[in-house]
Amino acid sequence: MVVILDTISANPVRPRHPEKANRPDALSPPKPDWIRVRAPNTRGYANTRRIVKENGLVTVCEEAGCPNIGECWDKKHATFMIMGDTCTRACAFCNVKTGMPGAIESSEPEYVAEATRKLGLAHVVVTSVDRDDLDDGGAEHFAQTIRAIRERCPATTIEILTPDFLRKDGALEKVVAAKPDVFNHNLETVPSRYLTVRPGARYFHSIRLLQRVKEIDPAIFTKSGIMVGLGEERHEVLQVMDDLRSADVDFLTIGQYLQPTRKHHAVIRYVTPEEFSSYETVAYTKGFLMVSASPLTRSSHHAGEDFAKLQAARATLSR
């Protein structure tokens, strides 16, 4: 493991995998005026942070450097990241550290459930690092976490954001059997950018994963998201929409890629709010129940409100 100085994010020193540490600096253009967020300094933010730390939990909000952390934590909305803070992959866009993860904390599902109760969450989002080192990719741990939340907070709806469980036979079935309300798996980018942006993954495996969820349990909402500004073309984004609809995915998110450090993939360009609005309009015409497309859209941003909209959209279709 190599430690390099992180000169962009608020956390100045983070362990970096040699694959990232040895990359030349990649410079991005200055951020435009439409990408601005408030500093996280409210009382609600502080209270959420305290509960997270008291329960010894990791959040993707912190580890991935999410720009919406101030807004979400002020409302007591946090996305819990299970199975540690170290990922077995080194995706070029991601700020989560890479290395050999430690053993899974067997009590973590209970800690997540208790934090969900303390925060009074009506809708909780749980994600994880990639755990290619585990036989099932962490699928059973996901299932245990879902069951623990159900037991302690029966009224809380549960959304999960999973890795791809690549080459982990039977893993997906374990997670789906636990019956989350929303199953999210992000494609992250268009197929042509996978080699440089997400080299450890396979685009059509991810499409098939989402399709398989619906085949096993059609009642579960499925969701996926991509980042733009990584060098993709508009027609490629539209093709991703078609691929997701062919897999019967309900909810699409599209957000601007923001470079975590100079050792990460550069921002090729900043997509304008008008372009995001156009993507949203087109996506709805293709049949998605819910679409969120804006510069600061992230997978878990407004997840609770969006879940209510998903339910309403499905109810309208079934009339």
UniProtKB/Swiss-Prot annotation:
Binds 2 [4Fe-4S] clusters per subunit. One cluster is coordinated with 3 cysteines and an exchangeable S-adenosyl-L-methionine. Keywords: 4Fe-4S, Cytoplasm, Iron, Iron-sulfur, Metal-binding, S-adenosyl-L-methionine, Transferase. One of its GO terms (molecular function) is metal ion binding. [4Fe-4S] cluster 2 binds at residues 87, 91, 94. It is found in: Cytoplasm. Belongs to the radical SAM superfamily. Lipoyl synthase family. This is Lipoyl synthase. It comes from Nitrobacter winogradskyi (strain ATCC 25391 / DSM 10237 / CIP 104748 / NCIMB 11846 / Nb-255). The lineage of its organism: Bacteria, Pseudomonadati, Pseudomonadota, Alphaproteobacteria, Hyphomicrobiales.
